[in-house]
From Swiss-Prot:
Protein family: Belongs to the aspartate/ornithine carbamoyltransferase superfamily. ATCase family.
Binding-site residues, carbamoyl phosphate: R54, T55, R104, H132, Q135, L267, P268
Binding-site residues for L-aspartate, renumbered to this chain: K83, R165, R228
Protein task: Catalyzes the condensation of carbamoyl phosphate and aspartate to form carbamoyl aspartate and inorganic phosphate, the committed step in the de novo pyrimidine nucleotide biosynthesis pathway.
Keyword Transferase in record: yes
Protein name as annotated: Aspartate carbamoyltransferase catalytic subunit
Gene symbol of the encoding locus: pyrB
Annotated catalysed reactions: carbamoyl phosphate + L-aspartate = N-carbamoyl-L-aspartate + phosphate + H(+)
Domain of life where this protein originates: Bacteria
Subunit structure: Heterododecamer (2C3:3R2) of six catalytic PyrB chains organized as two trimers (C3), and six regulatory PyrI chains organized as three dimers (R2).
Disulfide-bonded cysteines: none
The keyword Transferase is assigned to this record: yes
GO biological process: 'de novo' pyrimidine nucleobase biosynthetic process; 'de novo' UMP biosynthetic process; amino acid metabolic process
InterPro entries noted in UniProt: Asp/Orn_carbamoyltranf_P-bd (IPR006132), Asp/Orn_carbamoylTrfase (IPR006130), Asp/Orn_carbamoylTrfase_sf (IPR036901), Asp_carbamoyltransf (IPR002082), Asp_carbamoyltransf_Asp/Orn-bd (IPR006131)
């Protein structure tokens, strides 16, 4: 039973619990009308201390489509945080109003702190460069729906692997499925953090390699996960300007990829995928965004004990 559980990190749920969520998400996708009132009377609080379009709207749309309601804020300046209120007090107060919290925060570990003071489920919608578990559920559902299998894939991850929380969460999750291999494509400055390399990949004897060439990595990939270079994570903006366009996926590069390769991206896109790739049958990132809404519907219904 997932009722009343927090989701802070992909490892909080077992593979069996993932499958439970994916099964429900698939059922909702097939027959959304059947689920349009199951969260009637329930309230989701979206506490976004950091800008977001897709994740916040996905959560809000998901709850509204389940028949529930949404309260919250989309930037800290519009809340009592701007008056100096602590995270603890915000969470305790929101517990009085809502049945479920989805929170994004710039500080790593903030979701964990929130869960310590919450009697209602807390969903981590991204904490700094740490984890983004609902994006991971989105990614896994997309792969499962359109690729058919979460095992035995070669996954190339390209771009900002240092600060990219979606990358960290996805590696942690896919490492739990059998026979997956990873190709980590990034500039030296944006390599995967040591804790992912040592505690996840090497500790579990998972095959991986680190390279700097997208052209090389794309040849072997069953799944290519592109990410943007994140301006907001750089202290030195000249360093960002130097690295921002280091990887651009275009049709010329796609010619070197497998015919059935899947291109994913957590969005927003900046320059790292050319618009021409949108017309390629291997581009799945907008289908991925839609899967995100359905998987969040399934997750919230499960955490609230309504399905």
């Amino acid at each position: 039973m997932l009722k009343n559980k927090h989701l802070l990190d992909p490892s909080d749920f077992t593979i069996e619990e993932f499958d439970e969520i994916f099964k429900l998400a698939h059922q909702i996708m097939a027959n959304p009308k059947e689920y349009q009132n199951i969260c009637n009377g329930k309230i989701l609080a979206t506490l976004f201390y950091e800008p977001s379009t897709r994740t916040r709207l996905s959560f809000e749309s998901a709850m509204l489509r389940l028949g529930g309601q949404v309260i919250g804020f989309s930037e800290p300046n519009s809340s009592s945080v701007s008056k100096g209120e602590s995270l603890r007090d915000t969470i305790k107060t929101v517990n009085c109003y809502a049945d479920l919290i989805a929170m994004r925060h710039p500080l790593e570990g903030a979701a964990k702190v929130a869960s310590m003071y919450s009697d209602i489920p807390v969903i981590n919608a991204g904490d700094g460069g740490h984890q983004h578990p609902t994006q991971t559920l989105t990614d896994l559902l997309t792969i499962k729906e359109y690729k058919g299998n979460l095992e035995g894939n070669t996954i190339a991850l390209c771009g900002d692997l240092k600060f990219g929380r979606t990358v960290h969460s996805l590696i942690k999750a896919l490492s739990r499925y059998k026979n997956n291999k990873f190709i980590l494509i990034s500039p030296i400055e944006l390599r995967i953090p040591n804790y992912i390399r040592e505690q996840i990949l090497e500790k579990n004897n998972i095959e991986y390699k680190e390279i700097t060439s997208l052209e090389e990595g794309i040849k072997e990939a069953d799944i290519l996960y592109m990410t943007r270079i994140q301006r907001e994570r750089f202290v030195d903006q000249s360093e960002y300007e130097r690295l921002k366009d280091v990887y651009v996926l275009d049709e010329a590069k796609m010619k070197g990829a497998k015919e059935d390769m899947m291109v994913l991206h957590p969005l927003p896109r900046v320059n790292e995928i050319a618009y021409e790739v949108d017309e390629d049958s291997r581009a799945f990132y907008f289908k991925q965004a839609k899967c995100g809404m359905y998987v969040r519907m399934a997750l919230m219904a499960k955490l609230l004990g309504e399905a």
